[in-house]
A protein has these predicted regions:
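Metal-cofactor-dependent catalytic cores
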Residues: 1-190
């Protein structure tokens, strides 16, 4: 597949999107101009403010303890979600950290991982991609609800969002030095 596209959006979750209330709250997603990526996760930078992502190992309410340090979504998946769920689907609403201006991809397209090529020419490997499992809270939100619906009422929607449509979680534990990512950096298959 080669080049997939440029990073359209970088964002962090200031706080977990489901806790403490139990429903999906996208107001905690913050778009940033750039972000520092380390083996522990992502720290967004906006107007000089450093915002630690909720999945970063050092966040006080860390989601995943650093095991889900970075996630990536694609414009093509957002187009598919918007066609199915309508106007509630805005770019970045699924909460992934990087949104790439590229087509919908399948897991088999990403077996070699992803590489971000920064404007400075630095290549950053994003290893071992795996589909982000869709949750009841996000799926209920897309359907216009607040309190999560029972799983048996969401079977078709959860199936639609699985396999990468909801985004991919990648490994960054191998990184040995911080790297700054910016909107416009190019993403390609590894």
């Amino acid at each position: 597949m080669g080049e997939l596209g440029a990073i359209l959006r970088i964002q962090v979750q200031r706080e977990p999107l489901k806790a403490p209330h139990g429903w999906y709250d996208p107001s905690r997603i913050v778009a940033v101009d750039e972000a520092e990526l380390t083996s522990l996760g992502l720290v967004g930078i906006r107007g000089g403010e450093r915002i630690v992502d909720a999945h970063h190992a050092d966040h006080p309410r860390s989601r995943g303890g650093g095991r889900r340090a970075l996630s990536v979504g694609f414009r093509g998946h957002y187009e598919a979600m918007a066609a199915r769920f309508g106007e509630r689907v805005r770019l970045g609403i699924a909460g992934e950290n990087l949104v790439v201006d590229g087509p919908a991809v399948r897991m088999e397209d990403l077996t070699g991982g992803l590489v971000v090529v920064t404007a400075d020419g630095v290549e950053v490997e994003l290893r071992a991609p795996r589909p982000a499992a869709p949750c009841r809270e996000f799926t209920t939100f897309l359907l216009g609800g607040r309190e999560p619906r029972p799983r048996d009422e969401l079977v078709d929607e959860l199936e639609f969002l699985s396999g990468g449509t909801r985004g991919f979680i990648v490994s960054v534990g191998h990184l040995t030095a911080p790297v700054v990512l910016r909107v416009g950096d190019v993403v390609r298959v590894g």
